[in-house]
Amino acid sequence: ELENFFSEKPMDSLLYSIAINNMEKRNATVLKQFHELITENSFVLIGRCGNYIYKNDEDVTTLFIHSDMDSKIERTMHKQNMDRIKAKELIEYVDSKREAFHKRYTDETWGDARNYQLTVNSSVLGVEQTAEQIIAFIDKKHR
């Protein structure tokens, strides 16, 4: 199950249906194992419910970077060498999987600004300025 967590894949739906009553206990176990596994050193965690797992850790900065759909499509078309329709389909598919994964393990809404210390719209600032704003936020927070 920890392997499924790292790959952001929900458990088999049949197993999930059978074991629904034990969901909270299992989720707590997976999240605890994950927390113990990577708390030894400084690190950057992208996804995998990091905002939830580390929400009580003072040294942690949680952030969510989002973008408008047109910017996502343009970036995906360029990086994945695909047309607009396929890029949009891929984005919608990946985002729906991320949303379901986050909901499954945290019962929170993925991307909800209330669950992060900082949210940034990278389509407004661009990649470079987004990175600069994140660095400035972290520097200010940890002074």
What is each PLM-predicted segment?
Residues 1-42:
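ATP-dependent small-molecule kinase phosphotransfer cores
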Residues 20-27, 95, 109, 124:
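Conserved phosphate/pyrophosphate-binding and hydrolysis machinery centered on Walker-type P-loop NTPases
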Residues 24-28, 43-47, 99-104:
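Short gly/ser/thr-rich secondary-structure transition/capping motifs
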Residues 35, 107-143:
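NTP-dependent small-molecule kinase module
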Residues 36, 48, 52, 64, ...:
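Long, contiguous binding/interaction regions
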Residues 52-58, 111-113:
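Short loop/helix-cap segments at secondary-structure boundaries that form the rim of catalytic
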Residues 56-80, 84-92:
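Conserved phosphate-donor/acceptor-positioning beta-strand/loop module used by diverse small-molecule
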